[in-house]
Amino acid sequence: AATKYPVGVVAPGAIGHDINVGVRLLGSSVNADLSADQIDTLADTLHEHIPTGSEAEGSLQLTKSEVDHVAQSGAQWALRKDLAQQDDLVRAEEGGRLNDADPSKVSDAARALGAKQLGTLGGGEHFIEINVVEEVFNRAAALTMGLKENTLVAQIHCGSRGYGRQICADYIERFQAVASKHDIDPPSPGLAAVPLDSSEAEDYMGAMCAAANFAYANRQVLAHRVREAFNEVLDGQGEAFHTVYDVAHNLGQIEMHQVEGRHIRCYVHRKGAARAFGPGTPGISLPYRALGQPVLVPGSMGEASWVLLAKRESMEISFGSACHGAGRTMSRHEVSHQGAVSPVDEELEAQDVSIRSGG
């Protein structure tokens, strides 16, 4: 959804609790012909290196001041800590950092969660997958991305963890308290909103960008852990993994778009959507500016994922946005009332997929 800036509203619930949940894709030159034992050892090692589960805590225990540094710097913080390569940032959306972050607008409750959760995957639909490049349709684009058939890639899907969730909860509560002042009656309490030109909106956007930077740093640390695991299992081949792209899903951003023939400054809410800027659009990482922004579409478990490129038409059709995944056949609420579910681990093992989970 998009509104003309600064006429519209901002709603934290419309951006989502998991601010800047997104996907980092790592490509490699590592041949996919691994033995079953190597695959199992790799799965075990990844699980040991990367804390999983909704309450997971990482090895990077930070002070509240350090959390603010992460929130201000994003993936650049990881580069300074030798947890990143320069090219990781070059091939990340916005260089892995939003400039408008304001950690002073973040609560101590959120900081406390961020202090113990950087470098953790989380639970629910968050995942790290090791995949194989099965088929290439555009060889020139694949060459730019460093993708080659029958090589290994890694997908990292996670976000800002409890830090971002607490920020969203804090601002939904705050916006509910001032709704009458702004004469805004949302369709549900979770969609509490304020005008974009209000002080409350300015505070939220500073905090949201802080959470986005935390998420960029989190995916970067996890990429480093993936490299460490491959170094351990495959004799140093972790260094063969490079960032193809890192794309955000749940964000609100100020962008220029053409509407009815006029260039309009818009505030674009992307919830469960990825940015998809067409070729030549400012803001695309330099390696991809001529091609169009990469769009990473993870498939359902056991199904294929896709690496796509945005076309110019996306700017006209969807404010430069695209789907962010395979989608759902039913909601989380419906699933919770479904009763017995199929044994997913058995189904995946039947497809020679090795799975590890942490709750």
What are these regions (language model features)?
Residues A32:
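Patatin-like phospholipase
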Residues A1, Y5-A14, N20, D37-G359:
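Domain-length cofactor-binding catalytic modules of enzymes
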Residues V21-S29:
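Acidic/polar active-site rim loop that often engages polyanionic ligands
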